[in-house]
């Protein structure tokens, strides 16, 4: 059926390609005849046909791909069913004894004894032998099984509070009681309680006094004396004799004009009061009067 569908799709694609070629030839002829409007219509029709053909081809491709996917899934399922059937038939055909012998190479037949005919000493011996055989079987099975768990470098940290709820791979000795065989197999449960660290008290060490000893070669350094500077005193002005004479002369110069002015005023007043020298004759000069 799939082959027929592929042939049909191939034929439809060929037909569409032929029609497209014919339309291209017709549009070129119309352009040569200067019939632009008709050529434009033909080109638009051609574009529509191309788009529809592409859409159809995509749909066909998707359908064929889905059909292939469904075929592959069906084949895988059939293979799985076939293998499961083969395994189940093989297991039914092979007896369980062979399977057990392959898994447990060192098996021993159990010892059956009548309890009425055997004394208690023999009972204890038979119990001991059965326990030994069971122990051997368990050890052989444990060694033959491969370890599937991946060993991690950092094991998971156990909580600190779970001291009594741990699952152990060995028998605890508290269950055994007086049974010596159980005591030989059992192991004591390790106590995971944190041990108390011994408290170390700090010892008081004697304090050593350190004295600053000076070497005899190095001279002792004298402490520097601080220079005390007195506040600057104002210099006293020393007056020389020349300076004093100059100052006195300046004072006299300032005083004399006033004194001279006073003398002149007094002289003028006295001259007015006294008669003139021409009017008053002196005793030495003789009086020369003209007789009229």
Swiss-Prot record:
Spans of biased composition, class Polar residues?
A: 99-142, 245-292
List the coiled-coil residues: none
- Region Disordered, as annotated, extends over 92-161, 189-292
User: Which keywords accompany this UniProt record?
Assistant: Disulfide bond, Glycoprotein, Host cell membrane, Host membrane, Host-virus interaction, Membrane, Secreted, Transmembrane, Transmembrane helix, Viral attachment to host cell, Viral immunoevasion, Virion, Virus entry into host cell
Q: Which residues are glycosylated?
A: 70, 72, 81, 86, 92, 100, 113, 138-139, 141, 199, 203, 236, 254, 271, 276, 284
UniProt entry tagged with the keyword Transmembrane helix = yes
Q: Which domain of life is it from?
A: Viruses
Question: Which stretches are tagged as biased composition: Basic residues?
Answer: 148-157
What spans are recorded as compositionally biased (Low complexity)? Answer: 200-210
UniProt biased composition (Basic and acidic residues): 212-227
> Which residues are exposed on the Cytoplasmic face of the membrane?
1-37
A Pfam cross-reference name: Glycoprotein_G
Q: What is this protein called?
A: Major surface glycoprotein G
Provide the species name: Human respiratory syncytial virus B (strain 18537)
Lineage runs: Viruses, Riboviria, Orthornavirae, Negarnaviricota, Haploviricotina
